[in-house]
Amino acid sequence: MKIPEKPIFLIFVSLILASSLTFTATAKSTIEPCSSNDTCNALLGYTLYTDLKVSEVASLFQVDPISILLANAIDISYPDVENHILPSKLFLKIPITCSCVDGIRKSVSTHYKTRPSDNLGSIADSVYGGLVSAEQIQEANSVNDPSLLDVGTSLVIPLPCACFNGTDNSLPAVYLSYVVKEIDTLVGIARRYSTTITDLMNVNAMGAPDVSSGDILAVPLSACASKFPRYASDFGLIVPNGSYALAAGHCVQCSCALGSRNLYCEPASLAVSCSSMQCRNSNLMLGNITVQQTSAGCNVTTCDYNGIANGTILTMLTRSLQPRCPGPQQFAPLLAPPDTVPRDVMYAPAPSPDFDGPGSIASSPRSSMLPGGGILPGNPANGPAGSISTASASSVSYFFITFLISIASFSLALSS
């Protein structure tokens, strides 16, 4: 009796399935445990998957478009800047609020409404640039069958973030969630963001200085911290070096100059209705500084922003005697809204000197299209450490394997 042969197509599918299972990579991300309900300012490193208006990028993450521009030191004085079209492949820092959810730090304030031809893999890998995996979206939304995704479904997009008490080596810091690209090395990432290999390894609980495409690192950016009273609604405001941030309902703009630790706030240029910004018992307005040279030194008087409470802008008059009078206030340079992405930013890896061990210090940074963090002084020690979690590096592979299993099962049924 002749033994039925297996269909050649079934054998082909089995081989592809085996190879897919063998070579599916595993991406790592840093998890920060938490037990309180406090929040912090954090950043997402996001690369545009297509040309998008500033307002469209803001809609993807449900954040203020002006805040995105200021976080990247882009000049907001240009006409109709919120509708400026940003080029595909542009890297942006997206400001978000990092919360404590189910015992770990993450942001769950982003929702995405599905469109025709969407699947969890394309949403994770393309729309959100690998900041989340298909499996994480599936779990967050209790999706039983990923292949049955109705158009118009609102999905929670759990995004990675870290707080680590807003410090790095006891200095103010904001943490950027950065998706590693194929061209990246840990040394190059450290150099780009003005930190050290040791610091990155400590923060991300890494045993070796090895990274793979799709890994998500928590990168500490040097920052300027506020000292607002706890009752202020913007208590804990912290701004990374080279960036700006809005406060008090678009009334106040705060900045952190490159290499600085001093937060400077002044009235914002936006046309909004604001409460008084004059300091009590003086004729100084928010952001004003007066100096008077004396034989004992320089008397400096400043009208500082002290947060907002119940809709009232809080100001504080500060007087100090300094050895010498300060120079003009320094600001991070503002960039014109970008229309193109330089080729070297799109394709060139971050500068990568030879690695001499975990204690190596990355040399002075070279800025990319948009400014990174400022310079962290000295060698880090005992930095914050998260834990490592793993997830499928390719959501597309996840659904491709599911598809192949279905085909294989169907072929078996036909051959039986």
Swiss-Prot record:
The protein in question is named LysM domain-containing GPI-anchored protein 1
Q: Name one GO molecular function term.
A: peptidoglycan binding
Question: InterPro entries recorded for this chain?
Answer: LysM_dom (IPR018392), LysM_dom_sf (IPR036779)
Name which cysteines form disulfide bonds. Answer: C34-C100, C40-C163, C98-C161, C100-C163, C224-C256, C251-C279
- GPI-anchor amidated alanine lipid modification positions: A391
Prosegment residue ranges: 392-416
Biological process (GO) annotations held by this record are: defense response; immune response
Which Gene Ontology cellular component terms are annotated?
A: extracellular region; nucleus; plasma membrane; side of membrane
Origin organism of this chain?
A: Arabidopsis thaliana (Mouse-ear cress)
